[in-house]
């Protein structure tokens, strides 16, 4: 072995040292970034958008290295799609930066307040969280999203992408840091963590006192590893095993269109429909129409073959238990027949990731029962699951879809990346 070759332990030690040094640098600039004015923040975001477009050739070249390595390592095409950047997607990322610049700055917003009987004026205001760690997989656009939303909400971004996107992420962060430097702000306002080993994730999520919150975004394995292993507070952006229940009183053509949209519009995202539940009270011809429409759209059907063949379906892949709780992220869908809305609710309760659940029905009482009883961050009544999206909600860009119940639930936009503090202003009052 060459004298310059590092052992695995030395690589980990160096990585740990780098993470803690970067975390310390991030923590040190929190007070200054927290009070940065709205005008400068917006100017930086717009300049960053222009710079990304101007240097798109550099980004695409770096991204090509990641895609080449991904294909060589057998990466699935659904993940290649998440990884890929071209001029159109870079324009979209730049547009996202400009959009965030146009959003209302949440920092300093007064949520409530009053004057106490003794004359003390009190108010609750929004304040940044501090150092915001992001751990995510093969989507380099998240790097820029994290920077934009962190900066606008007064936070410092500490990002750790997948090793599969290391060239893309390195180039994107370099460009963002160049823009920050132009505005005389620390390059540490956004930093990329090393990803030579998975140990850097553990270093990040246990950096209590340096990192204020960690938000994982990706597959179930990544999210569970972060949430269960962290000592730093986390916000869980869950996987999306989204169900669409078609009630016997649904408008069938409308329901079919919504299921196909939810499944095929972009199958590699977390709001894609992964399971279609068919009311047993639907006629055999209606059930068959749903299955055939999906197949004609290029979707592979997984289900209990005997159950689906009973109403005439063909070319069905026998489902295993795994199919019912899978986030396919591909042109695959699980299909099951259930006993009415309560059967749908029971199935969803067993397999849901509590992301988005949908119902198609013209019965108001059935719709209300579904909405009241299903446990999910978002409930769609006669609408595609694809609408679970911060931009669609009118919230602007989001950092992810939170499926937990504390701090934030659903699309996490700027207000969800803040906390609050109470400010009391008196004139010398003392408490008796």
Swiss-Prot record:
The keyword Metal-binding does not apply. Keywords: Amino-acid biosynthesis, Cytoplasm, NADP, Oxidoreductase, Proline biosynthesis. It comes from the Bacteria. Its EC number is 1.2.1.41. One of its GO terms (biological process) is L-proline biosynthetic process. GO terms for molecular function: glutamate-5-semialdehyde dehydrogenase activity; NADP binding. PANTHER family: DELTA-1-PYRROLINE-5-CARBOXYLATE SYNTHASE (PTHR11063:SF8), GLUTAMATE SEMIALDEHYDE DEHYDROGENASE (PTHR11063). HAMAP family: ProA (MF_00412). Belongs to the gamma-glutamyl phosphate reductase family. Catalyzes the NADPH-dependent reduction of L-glutamate 5-phosphate into L-glutamate 5-semialdehyde and phosphate. The product spontaneously undergoes cyclization to form 1-pyrroline-5-carboxylate. This is Gamma-glutamyl phosphate reductase. The gene is proA.
